[in-house]
């Protein structure tokens, strides 16, 4: 089975790295995983890859703007587009996807895997035949995933989602940011160990009487500038919330 085509969304930045990935799964029902942000060069690149055929479907991993906001531009190019995500109360114009729903994609079949933690509506898409995972914002090489406490992020859910992905035994992962991940199980184990290490650092701060979240960020990370500092603060808040949840 052919690998998906990586089509960058063209939105580099401090929190998106080189920018978002979208993944075109070609075949009988051409399917795009994630919608990007609607930039014209990205939409044109999708059309060029399709060679005049219509894009049949878009599967969005979660509702964050860098993954979902391009849907209007895609619909403008392909009006009959089947757009799907895990629908929340404020979502409009999407067909709903739920955990373990099966969806045709190219010549393959994907299974939606609900993986909350980074976002409550986060889905990964699993190609069991290829043992390939479309990972969204669950995994990314060379960095860790932000857990945005107060904006739907939940560290306990994220760790449980990592365990669920590990149980699938993926051989390759196609992430929402960064290059293809050739050893996703190793990365999942590294992420779990990293979160355990970070929790121990937070606990050490609390035991030393450092309880202000901004002070904890400064002690653990050193000097950061926004927006990276805000991202670190949200993740520290997620660790503090996990500690509170598990102490009651």
Predicted feature residues:
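Histidine-centered divalent metal-coordination motifs
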Residues: 61-67, 118, 177, 239
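C-terminal regulatory/interaction regions
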Residues: 204-248
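Glycine/small-residue-rich loop that forms an oxyanion/phosphate-binding "nest" at active or ligand-binding sites
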Residues: 83-89, 93-95
């Amino acid at each position: 089975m052919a690998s998906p085509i990586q089509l960058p969304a063209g939105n580099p930045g401090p929190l998106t790295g080189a920018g978002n990935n979208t993944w075109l799964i070609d075949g009988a029902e051409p399917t795009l995983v994630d919608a990007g942000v609607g930039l014209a060069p990205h939409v044109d690149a999708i059309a060029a890859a399709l060679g005049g055929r219509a894009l049949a479907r878009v599967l969005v991993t979660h509702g964050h703007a860098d993954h979902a906001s391009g849907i209007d531009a895609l619909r403008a190019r392909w009006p009959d587009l089947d757009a799907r995500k895990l629908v929340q109360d404020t979502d409009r114009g999407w067909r709903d996807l739920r955990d373990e729903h099966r969806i045709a994609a190219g010549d393959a079949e994907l299974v939606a895997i609900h993986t909350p933690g980074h976002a409550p509506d986060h889905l990964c898409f699993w190609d069991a035949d290829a043992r390939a995972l479309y990972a969204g914002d669950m995994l990314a090489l060379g960095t860790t995933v932000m857990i945005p406490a107060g904006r739907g992020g939940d560290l306990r859910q994220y760790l449980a989602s990592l365990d669920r992905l590990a149980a699938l035994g993926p051989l390759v992962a196609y992430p929402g940011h960064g290059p293809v991940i050739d050893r996703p199980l190793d990365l999942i184990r590294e992420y779990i160990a990293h979160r355990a290490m970070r929790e121990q650092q937070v606990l050490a701060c609390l035991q030393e009487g450092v309880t202000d979240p901004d002070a904890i960020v400064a002690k653990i990370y050193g000097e950061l500038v926004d927006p990276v500092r805000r991202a670190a603060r949200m993740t520290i808040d997620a660790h503090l919330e996990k500690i509170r949840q598990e102490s009651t």
